Amino acid sequence: MKIIFMGSPEFAIPALKELVLSKHNVIAVFTSKPKKRDRYLNIQRSPIHKLASALSIPVYTPDSLKTNDVQNLIATFDADVIVVAAYGLIIPKAILKMKKYGCINIHPSMLPKYRGAAPIQRTIINGEKETAVCIIQMDQGVDTGDIILCQKFHLAKNICFSELHDQCAKVGAKLVVKAINYIHTLPRIPQSQDRASYAHKLSKSESKINWYESAYTIDCKIRGMNPWPGTFFTHNNCNIKVLKAKIVNNSHNLQPGTVKIANNDKLLVACQEHFLELLSLQLPGRKELSSDQFLCGYHILPDTVLQ
């Protein structure tokens, strides 16, 4: 089977690698345009651009897929299917219907749950116990297409965004090859609109920790929002990021946000339910610190109430 691959970030890397190693033939790659990344105007290509170039696969970086020139270019490729993995551009109807088997997409959630831009993050933030990777036949909606294959799995305890991201990418890579191997015979299963939800893009407005939530809820937020946009609390008008934490299931009658220091090196904060031990923190413009390093260099008193 001849394949056009469309993808840009690290999430798409395992899929392109698996397709190249398979019996199928990736004949072209479409990815995001190279960007100026720093003050020296150095050009940074996407991870997929770098990989495709290393594999000697032709690479195309259009600003849009809506122009006649780009659509005519794609039409000239003798491809059977287009595989999409976190590409970043809207794929118009003309391209969705262009090839024999259309466009298929790798989506890291248990569709129809968590359609949209941030399914992995929202899965963790909302405390889900299991998730999935789905291969869907793309239509004009946002992740609304019929499901071709779906692989469910349980989330490891305390899993963070980067770990689940990599796990979903690897599962999706194997699954998309299987989908193409059996694309002639696999049924297309419509999604239930009644159970649909949308995983909105993360916002910095969500970053501030609310100590009146449970320790479990806050821990899920910390794990799901690291590295971006991160989570923080305020002390003496300083926004301090929390990069890693641990739930301590001790009951208390303290005001949420109250600081307790155990054994001179453990930083505990009372939440609505239980405590959260802050394991890794970061001051503005500084490197990551363990809790004992933080307590050595930053003055925070027991019984302080954090904002």
Curated annotation (Swiss-Prot):
NCBIfam families: fmt. (6S)-5,6,7,8-tetrahydrofolate binds at residues 109-112. This is Methionyl-tRNA formyltransferase. It catalyses: L-methionyl-tRNA(fMet) + (6R)-10-formyltetrahydrofolate = N-formyl-L-methionyl-tRNA(fMet) + (6S)-5,6,7,8-tetrahydrofolate + H(+). GO terms for molecular function: methionyl-tRNA formyltransferase activity. Attaches a formyl group to the free amino group of methionyl-tRNA(fMet). The formyl group appears to play a dual role in the initiator identity of N-formylmethionyl-tRNA by promoting its recognition by IF2 and preventing the misappropriation of this tRNA by the elongation apparatus. InterPro entries: Fmt, Formyl_trans_C, Formyl_trans_C_sf, Formyl_transf_N, Formyl_transf_N_sf, Formyl_transferase-like_C_sf, Met-tRNA-FMT_C, Met-tRNA-FMT_N. Keywords: Protein biosynthesis, Transferase. GO terms for cellular component: cytosol. PANTHER family: METHIONYL-TRNA FORMYLTRANSFERASE (PTHR11138), METHIONYL-TRNA FORMYLTRANSFERASE, MITOCHONDRIAL (PTHR11138:SF5). Belongs to the Fmt family. Pfam families: Formyl_trans_C (PF02911), Formyl_trans_N (PF00551).
